[in-house]
């Protein structure tokens, strides 16, 4: 298939074989204030397909904040454990929506849930998930770690390590990397080209929660933060092109 101007042929320069793509649930909302926006879900699925077409094995974790966020529920008086489980179920809904969009594009996809719900998703079995990746199926890991008090950032880092991913790619909406302060409210915010995990923790930069950062650091797992709303952004960043921040040891 010929490449569009926004998606140059980078197949010869991509050095990754297996990666984790982490996106927030809010990324699926589009211009809506809640839920899934099907055209937006399809656009992101097309980004994933463009990388899958290069032969890269792809894991995904999608947050659930577009439907329900456990911390928000807890802050409003809901029991924390129950709120977190509700948030995990929201991630399953998002995973099923993304699976539908990917398979509509011809990409075989498996939703793998940390909480058993056999009618709609496979249970998490590491060796089976690895085999899916080897068969070039996209694996979407849902329901977080299956435990309350752990974020989907931590789940993404955990699964990336278990699946032997070479890096985590964090697709952000409206932000193209890691900044020293919020670029949406500070015009003088400066973007880092690269930053260490220790600096992220020490400076409390908003990348991932501290548990996820520490887990990535301790296993020497690089993290690339880029803008998901840029057409061809995921594919380009895999080739070292475009704007992004690399977080490393």
From Swiss-Prot:
UniProt protein name: Uridylate kinase
Positions contributing to ATP binding: 22-25, 65, 69, 173, 179, 182
Function as written in the Swiss-Prot or TrEMBL entry: Catalyzes the reversible phosphorylation of UMP to UDP.
Stretches for region Involved in allosteric activation by GTP: 30-35
Gene Ontology terms for molecular function: ATP binding; UMP kinase activity
One GO cellular component term noted in the UniProt record for this chain: cytoplasm
UniProtKB keywords: Allosteric enzyme, ATP-binding, Cytoplasm, Kinase, Nucleotide-binding, Pyrimidine biosynthesis, Transferase
Species of the source: Ruegeria sp. (strain TM1040)
The keyword Zinc is assigned to this record: no
Cellular localisation: Cytoplasm
Family listed: Belongs to the UMP kinase family.
Catalyzed chemical reaction(s): UMP + ATP = UDP + ADP
Pathway stated in the Swiss-Prot or TrEMBL entry: Pyrimidine metabolism; CTP biosynthesis via de novo pathway; UDP from UMP (UMPK route): step 1/1
Activity regulation remarks: Allosterically activated by GTP. Inhibited by UTP.
Domain of life of the native organism: Bacteria
Pfam families: AA_kinase (PF00696)
Subunit structure and binding partners: Homohexamer.
Binding, UMP: 64, 84, 145-152
Gene: pyrH
EC assignment: 2.7.4.22
GO BP field: 'de novo' CTP biosynthetic process; UDP biosynthetic process
């Amino acid at each position: 298939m010929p490449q569009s101007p926004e998606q140059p042929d980078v197949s010869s320069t991509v050095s990754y074989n297996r990666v984790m793509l982490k996106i927030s649930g809010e990324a699926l909302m589009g211009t809506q204030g809640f839920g899934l926006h099907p055209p937006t879900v399809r656009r992101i699925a097309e980004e994933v397909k463009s990388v899958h077409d290069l032969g890269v094995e792809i894991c995904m974790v999608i947050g659930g904040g577009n439907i329900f966020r456990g911390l928000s529920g807890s802050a409003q008086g809901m029991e924390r454990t129950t709120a977190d489980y509700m948030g995990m179920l929201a991630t399953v809904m998002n995973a099923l929506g993304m699976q539908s969009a990917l398979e509509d594009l011809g990409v075989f996809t498996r939703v793998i849930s940390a909480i058993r719900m056999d009618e709609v998703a496979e249970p998490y079995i590491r060796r089976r998930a690895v085999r899916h990746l080897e068969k070039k199926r996209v694996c979407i890991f849902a329901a977080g770690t299956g435990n309350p008090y752990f974020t989907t950032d931590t789940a993404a880092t955990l699964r990336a390590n278990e699946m032997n991913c070479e890096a985590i790619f964090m697709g952000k909406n409206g932000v193209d990397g890691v900044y020293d302060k919020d670029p949406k409210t500070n015009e003088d915010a400066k973007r880092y080209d690269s930053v260490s995990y220790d600096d992220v923790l020490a400076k409390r930069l908003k990348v991932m929660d501290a548990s996820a950062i520490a887990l990535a650091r301790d296993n020497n797992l690089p993290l690339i933060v880029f803008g998901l709303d840029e057409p061809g952004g995921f594919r380009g960043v895999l080739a070292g092109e475009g704007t992004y921040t690399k977080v490393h040891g």
